[in-house]
């Protein structure tokens, strides 16, 4: 799997932005990706050193539209911790400046 196929998008929430100060970032990743895949992809794409990767499978929520019901899609969320000497990831830094 290519590095660009592993990381789908960054997760930008209040809690993820609070973690960015401690060099902890969250990404939505491919559902077939492993911790090792995520570690290699983040290191390649952003040029940083990864300390630890935690992964959580997030189930889709039940949604209704009138009498029709369905589910949002399932996703996989990766929390990536960087080493202290790594540089910050620019995607999250730009979001902090816009607030």
UniProtKB/Swiss-Prot annotation:
GO molecular function terms attached to this record: rRNA binding; structural constituent of ribosome
InterPro entries per UniProt: Nucleotide-bd_a/b_plait_sf, Ribosomal_uL23-like, Ribosomal_uL23/eL15/eS24_sf
Keywords from the UniProt entry: Ribonucleoprotein, Ribosomal protein, RNA-binding, rRNA-binding
Domain of life: Bacteria
Pfam families, per the entry: Ribosomal_L23
Keyword RNA-binding: yes
GO biological process, one term: translation
HAMAP family per the UniProt record, alphabetical: Ribosomal_uL23_B
Biological role: One of the early assembly proteins it binds 23S rRNA. One of the proteins that surrounds the polypeptide exit tunnel on the outside of the ribosome. Forms the main docking site for trigger factor binding to the ribosome.
Subunit structure: Part of the 50S ribosomal subunit. Contacts protein L29, and trigger factor when it is bound to the ribosome.
Family membership noted in the UniProt record: Belongs to the universal ribosomal protein uL23 family.
Protein name, as recorded: Large ribosomal subunit protein uL23
Organism: Oenococcus oeni (strain ATCC BAA-331 / PSU-1)
């Amino acid at each position: 799997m290519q590095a660009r196929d592993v990381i789908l998008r960054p997760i930008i929430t209040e809690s993820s932005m609070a973690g960015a100060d401690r060099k902890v970032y969250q990404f939505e990743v491919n559902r077939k990706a492993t911790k090792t895949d995520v570690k290699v992809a983040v290191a390649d794409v952003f040029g940083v050193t990864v300390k630890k990767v935690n992964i959580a499978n997030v189930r889709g929520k039940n949604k209704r539209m009138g009498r029709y019901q369905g589910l949002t899609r399932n996703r996989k969320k990766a929390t990536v911790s960087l080493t202290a000497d790594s540089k910050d990831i620019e995607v999250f830094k730009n979001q902090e400046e816009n607030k």
